[in-house]
A protein has these predicted regions:
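An active-site-proximal "capping" alpha-helix that borders the catalytic cofactor pocket
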Residues: 70, 111-124
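Hydrophobic, well-structured mid-protein blocks that either form specific transmembrane helices
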Residues: 122-157
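His-Asp-centered metal-binding catalytic motifs of divalent-metal-dependent phosphohydrolases/nucleases
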Residues: 86-105, 111, 115, 135-145
């Protein structure tokens, strides 16, 4: 695993910054927590710059806390993945959701492409080399489940696994029901909660999202550490789902 100094600050240095966030094509001023920037050490300066390219959103399942969790996951995965460049990986994590597309939008399957395009623009303005830029944009493009792409570089494999780890386990449970609430979905279908005799509809029922998507995610991990962590989190996810169904008497 490699790292270089481009965009890095001195170890322990805290960047105090005020970041400008996109919202519907307009720049907005908003203060960014120095502690959040510090979480991306030794790439605090890079984080402070790239975060200005993020859409401002009220989606708590794809907020700054999500970026921090994905970065924590990515650093763990990179320890066992040969050839990963930590700085390129940090840039990919920071920009992987820079264009926000709501779950119910017809453009949802284009979210990673749109984010990759903006990521390329951001890195070009920072003067990044074409090869490094391409590694980052490829990782951003491939990370999305909706895109259905297979990652081939270490950075892309790590980002995809790190992002998907945040969709399973207990955090995944919380994000699932949070998103369902935002979209106005019901908790479950009252006549057949487990969907044994009907087509699953996770746009209408939060619980349907477990068998339709979440419970199948653990089989698609491509990094060594990612597979191991996915098995652990999948067990928590399955236990929650089974317990929920049991309480409903279904």
């Amino acid at each position: 695993m490699k790292s270089n100094a481009r965009g890095a600050t001195q170890p322990g240095q805290v960047v105090h910054c005020e970041t400008t966030l996109f919202e519907s094509g307009h720049w907005k001023r908003d203060k960014l927590s120095p502690m959040f920037v510090e979480a991306f050490a030794p790439f605090q300066e890079l984080a402070a710059r790239l975060l200005t390219w993020l859409d401002k959103s009220t989606d708590g399942s794809h907020d700054l806390s999500h970026l921090k969790r994905v970065w924590q996951n990515a650093r763990l995965l990179a320890q066992e993945e040969e050839g990963a460049n930590l700085q390129l990986l940090a840039a990919a994590v920071l920009l992987h959701d820079c264009v926000h597309v709501e779950k119910g939008s017809p453009l949802r399957d284009q979210a990673s492409r749109l984010s990759a395009e903006r990521a390329g623009e951001a890195l070009r303005k920072l003067g990044w080399a074409t090869r490094d830029l391409e590694v980052v944009t490829d990782a951003v493009l491939c990370h999305s489940y909706s895109a259905g792409l297979v990652p081939t570089t270490p950075e892309a494999r790590i980002l995809q696994d790190a992002d998907r780890l945040d969709a399973i386990g207990l955090v995944g449970v919380a994000r699932c029901f949070y998103t369902a609430g935002r979209l106005g979905s019901s908790l479950y279908q009252p006549d057949d909660p487990a969907g044994k005799g009907r087509a699953l509809d996770d746009k209408s029922y939060a619980l349907d999202h477990f068998p339709k998507k979440l419970l199948g995610l653990a089989t698609g991990f491509t990094t060594i550490a990612g597979r191991r962590m996915a098995r652990q989190r999948h067990a928590h996810l399955q236990e929650f789902y089974n317990g929920f169904i049991l309480e409903l008497g279904a």
